[in-house]
Amino acid sequence: YHGDRNGGLDSKEAFADFAEQCFDMGYKAFKIHGWHEGDAKEEAENVLHVAKKVGDKMTLMLDPACQLKTFADALYVGKACDEANFFWLEDPYRDSGVSAFSHKRLREMLKTPILQTEHIRGLETKCDFLLAGGTDFLRSDPEYDMGITGAIKISHLAESFGVDVEI
């Protein structure tokens, strides 16, 4: 899930090499799940390094999985995503993705779109988050969002606002 300090995805070079391997296997996009220490400087360096190696041939996304410690850390890493032309920044910091206000502020300060609502459950709360301006994309998970019926309703919600939903 995340980068692994015990080998595997243990460095920015390893992430970039893996992204290149994925491209060689035919993948057109690559989502980074960095390390779980929440080191903003290291995450930003990883973003820029991977983009330098494959950014001109793959769509890149970053999911820190709520591991960045502060809003400022999310802004710092988000600026790296801007520089590297990332497609989205997902669940960036440790509010667990539940503050529409703070994510609206982050959206206003970045050009990289924000993907939120993985940790927001149900149709109404996702609608509230979207209407408050806290996200550019919606996330739905049938396991947690009222089953297949709930996921379909969330998809219809997204469609009605012209927003994509990631399932």
Spell out what each predicted region is.
Residues 15-22, 46, 50:
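Structured alpha-helical segments in the cores of large, soluble enzyme domains
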Residues 34-167:
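Catalytic core of soluble alpha/beta enzymes
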Residues 1-16, 63-71, 115:
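Active-site mouth loops of central-metabolism enzymes
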Residues 12, 24-27, 83, 158:
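Generic intrinsically disordered, low-complexity segments enriched for polar/acidic and small residues
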Residues 18-33:
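Catalytic domains of carbohydrate-active enzymes, especially glycoside hydrolases
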